[in-house]
Amino acid sequence: MKTLLLTLVVVTIVCLDLGYTMTCYNQQSSQPQTTTTCAESSCYKKTWRDHRGTIIERGCGCPTVKPGIQRVCCATDKCNN
């Protein structure tokens, strides 16, 4: 009986996602829309202009940016579209 209970506990721990994971978009501006599962608790969207036009980068976390780059960070699934 104890073995069965221990087995059920182990299976439950392995099968459950014990830490919350976040889903963020992670494509560059000219790429097809893709998502990734992140360990971080936020998503970001960076926007800037260069000789190619407006560039948009998306991903997990909330990185620091250089002057002239706009950054938006958010904390819900797929919020960085």
Swiss-Prot record:
Belongs to the three-finger toxin family. Short-chain subfamily. Type I alpha-neurotoxin sub-subfamily. One of its GO terms (cellular component) is extracellular region. It holds the Pfam family Toxin_cobra-type. This is Short neurotoxin 2. Disulfide bonds join C24-C43, C38-C60, C62-C73, C74-C79. Its main location: secreted. Binds to muscle nicotinic acetylcholine receptor (nAChR) and inhibit acetylcholine from binding to the receptor, thereby impairing neuromuscular transmission. CDD domains: TFP_snake_toxin. It comes from Drysdalia coronoides (White-lipped snake). Keywords: Acetylcholine receptor inhibiting toxin, Disulfide bond, Ion channel impairing toxin, Neurotoxin, Postsynaptic neurotoxin, Secreted, Signal, Toxin. Residues 1-21 form the signal peptide. It comes from the Eukaryota. GO terms for molecular function: acetylcholine receptor inhibitor activity; ion channel regulator activity; toxin activity. Expressed by the venom gland. It is found in: Secreted.
